[in-house]
Amino acid sequence: MATYIQRVQCISALLSVVLTTLVSCQIPRDRLSNIGVIVDEGKSLKIAGSHESRYIVLSLVPGVDLENGCGTAQVIQYKSLLNRLLIPLRDALDLQEALITVTNDTMTSADVPQSRFFGAVIGTIALGVATSAQITAGIALAEAREAKRDIALIKESMTKTHKSIELLQNAVGEQILALKTLQDFVNDEIKPAISELGCETAALRLGIKLTQHYSELLTAFGSNFGTIGEKSLTLQALSSLYSANITEIMTTIRTGQSNIYDVIYTEQIKGTVIDVDLERYMVTLSVKIPILSEVPGVLIHKASSISYNIDGEEWYVTVPSHILSRASFLGGANIADCVESRLTYICPRDPAQLIPDSQQKCILGDTTRCPVTKVVDNLIPKFAFVNGGVVANCIASTCTCGTGRRPISQDRSKGVVFLTHDNCGLIGVNGIELYANRKGHDATWGVQNLTVGPAIAIRPVDISLNLAAATDFLQDSRAELEKARKILSEVGRWYNSGATLITIIVVMIVVLVVIIVIVIVLYRLRRSMLMSNPAGRISRDTYTLEPKIRHMYTNGGFDAMTEKR
């Protein structure tokens, strides 16, 4: 049976290698490099869909049951240091528990613990609606309450034992790692030293060791003790602090050695303080270790692009920043939520994305389908590192080779130039000097004739020159407009000015006064004439406004006519 299992494992590993090789070979990296597209060898994909939980109970004060009270004063001083560190943390946890409560608690018997978190209802007291941060804190609180009974038993047993590490497992398969610090030092060094050096010397040694331990404690768990949120555990400091092998501590994780390496490398082991006991000076941390699942036959390649030349014109191919290749699928990869280790991308979900058909065929080697755009500025990269060498566009850039700074002349039929330590050594691009890797090999990869697709709009069009011309035109038109305004302001100024209006008003007043004076003079003249010539003495030849018929009646003319009759 064991032989059969080994054969199955070997066949699975062989198939995985074959699939990975086929996937990596379907992207013609040499052909793409000739148009400035650089694609690396790729890394595998692992999905972190779930996690395992651990609880680390830290006993921060050793049990000092020494004779004659040796070391008691040093322990009291050490506890005062711990109080300043732990009291704010304890108060924050109390506030969290006051705001976030778990209802519908499931009763558990004393013998058989039951998992009741998934049946719990997370609610709030002081806040109306639970936010995501509150729910996260509520989950941690619920998990802490689940393990509360087991943690209490651990604390009780740790106060009665001198064992340094106890690994216990509760009923739901979660493990509580109890670390009792300094106990080995007290048992192995302090007690024997009392009989040899005396109480005072032993107490001083204990005080020095406690101070050293406090410093190492802050180094190992400073980020975790500074907040009630989730922080990465410093595993190297944990290993140094407790003189334990991290691999041995994590042997119970249901995962392979490579997964453990990826988890440690990316610092994905998170710890959260869920309990602070100031009576026993114990701190409980909830530790989450992600469970990784590798997706077979999948590689994620990092892609980039530099400018290249065709017939003296500079062009640029746009490609996704990351390419995901699967047996029959080629697309982009959204790694915004992923973390990268040396050999793997660890993602919470499948990062595959669809890309246009033309871009897909371009990545597969059909350069006639590559979407290109003409380079109109200097922001496009001109060189990149490939296989220990440098690929550069030496038509659009100034390239030199060797310590003598020999200029490099690029063939106009070639899009880029490949430079390595063997054919160049010291490489210079636009004044930047680069030393190629001595182990790098010639990366020319057989230069081929280049044909690319038509230029398309794949990014905002650069119209900086047109905008500059339009800006100059606007400035000129503004100057002309100001001149026109000045001319218009001068036209009609004589009647629009305030002095003109005042002059008109004064003239009108003078004319009005003259008219009034003339009327008064005429009136007085007529009056004087009437007073000097009464009505009876007016000459008949004198012209008056009175009708002549009136004189006929008043001067006897009518009586003469009667006598004649």
From Swiss-Prot:
Topology, Cytoplasmic side: 522-565
Cystine bridges: which residues? Answer: 70-199, 338-347, 362-370, 394-399, 401-424
| Keywords annotated in UniProt | Coiled coil, Disulfide bond, Fusion of virus membrane with host cell membrane, Fusion of virus membrane with host membrane, Glycoprotein, Host cell membrane, Host membrane, Membrane, Signal, Transmembrane, Transmembrane helix, Viral envelope protein, Viral penetration into host cytoplasm, Virion, Virus entry into host cell
Please list where the region (Fusion peptide) is annotated: 117-141
Name the glycosylated positions: 104, 245, 449
Which stretches are Extracellular in the membrane topology?
26-500
Q: Which GO terms describe its cellular component?
A: host cell plasma membrane; membrane; viral envelope; virion membrane
Please verify whether the record's keywords include Coiled coil: yes
Coiled coil (UniProt feature): 142-170, 466-491
Its biological purpose is as follows:
Class I viral fusion protein. Under the current model, the protein has at least 3 conformational states: pre-fusion native state, pre-hairpin intermediate state, and post-fusion hairpin state. During viral and plasma cell membrane fusion, the heptad repeat (HR) regions assume a trimer-of-hairpins structure, positioning the fusion peptide in close proximity to the C-terminal region of the ectodomain. The formation of this structure appears to drive apposition and subsequent fusion of viral and plasma cell membranes.
Q: Which family does it belong to?
A: Belongs to the paramyxoviruses fusion glycoprotein family.
* Miscellaneous comment in the UniProt entry for this protein: Sendai virus or recombinant F protein are widely used in cellular biology to fuse cells.
Quaternary structure?
A: Homotrimer of disulfide-linked F1-F2. Interacts with HN and M proteins.
What this protein is called in its record is Fusion glycoprotein F0
